């Protein structure tokens, strides 16, 4: 399940791609399959181990070109261990909302992005997220949870303050918003479990009907907002 549109970001074979806050690697995998030189970064040793295992499986299955590469690095997004201007593309998907000092993480993203390079930054969208916060304290108050809700304009301002220029916006995962509202309101009921099964089925099978429905609903109900930015050359 990808939040970032790779065609819109312009990820191509041979590019260096940094996936910040990679989790278990979902965005790193797609860049790897496209032939990029991928570096996936996270603080979780467990998630990085999973990322390495899946990248190895992708290579073994022949799903990545032989000249592509993938590495997983444990690092703090506020102090990245890379030189300035290192990466053609940077992805930060659903991570900034977890970081109290997001300004430092954004500054590091901008620092390691090459001049003329592009980045995609995704966060939970304001309205669906506000509903979740209103329905459940546990949703955001647990350790490592969400510490803020962004408006798209606010996130754009923060990225531009770091020297980046917003070049596009998108929304994703409209079918996931009602699931999280149900889960926040009712926790693990039969309805919530059934909805979760529907989402898993949709992710695996990607039927035309649900793909069309989500694409149509994304502008209104998209769970995530995606900002595409560019570092001036």
Give names to the regions the model predicted.
Residues 94-98:
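A short His-aromatic
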Residues 124-148, 157:
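Short, glycine-/aromatic-enriched active-site segment of Class I SAM-dependent methyltransferases
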Residues 103-118:
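A short glycine-rich, Lys/Arg-flanked "PGG" loop and its adjoining helix->strand segment in the class I
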Residues 122-124, 172:
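Alpha/beta-hydrolase-fold catalytic nucleophile elbow
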Residues 147-162, 169:
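Short alpha-helix
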Residues 168-205, 223-224:
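Conserved catalytic loop of SAM-dependent methyltransferase domains
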Residues 1-83, 89-93, 103-106, 147, ...:
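Conserved N-terminal segment of class I S-adenosyl-L-methionine
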Residues 38, 119-120:
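A short hydrophobic/small-residue beta-strand
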